[in-house]
Amino acid sequence: MKLNDLRDKDGATHSKKRLGRGIGSGSGKTAGRGVKGQKARSGVAINGFEGGQMPLYRRLPKRGFNNIFAKSFVVVSLARIQEAVDAKKLDAKATVTAEALVAAGVIRRVKDGVRVLSDGELKAKLAFDVAGASKAAIEKIEKAGGSVKLPEKAAAE
């Protein structure tokens, strides 16, 4: 067998239907599009329109709202911070702040602050000055000999 002998098995492929090539073909003239009207024309797709039937987005009830005061925190795990310390990207003696994490490449941008979560283990003794931290994360940080400074309101979380 040679490369030029290779071909698909019989019946594996179908030749495409050639539309609009005379009425004898069975799909000539209107080419399977019916008669006139918007859908017979080219370039038609009305998103969300279901032919007059009440569309799905109107059948479902409205729910919820967007809180304009919602804070969006960047989430960082303890494991990710420990990796940065091990790789010497984050100074273990300096305070860990949002700006320090951006400079170390741990996070890309600070939205409304950084929230530390307890994923992974923390071996380094670090001082944190962040917008938020989970209770478990605070426990792990203090167990490693570090400290956490939170804003007044976030401390009640």
Curated annotation (Swiss-Prot):
Keywords: Ribonucleoprotein, Ribosomal protein, RNA-binding, rRNA-binding. GO terms for molecular function: rRNA binding; structural constituent of ribosome. Disulfide bonds: none annotated. GO terms for cellular component: cytosolic large ribosomal subunit. The keyword Cytoplasm does not apply. SUPFAM superfamilies: Ribosomal proteins L15p and L18e. One of its GO terms (biological process) is translation. The keyword Plastid does not apply. Belongs to the universal ribosomal protein uL15 family. Residues 1-13 have a biased composition (Basic and acidic residues). It holds the Pfam family Ribosomal_L27A. This is Large ribosomal subunit protein uL15. It comes from Mesorhizobium japonicum (strain LMG 29417 / CECT 9101 / MAFF 303099) (Mesorhizobium loti (strain MAFF 303099)). Residues 1-39 are annotated as: Disordered. Part of the 50S ribosomal subunit. PROSITE patterns: RIBOSOMAL_L15. Residues 21-35 have a biased composition (Gly residues). HAMAP family: Ribosomal_uL15. Binds to the 23S rRNA.
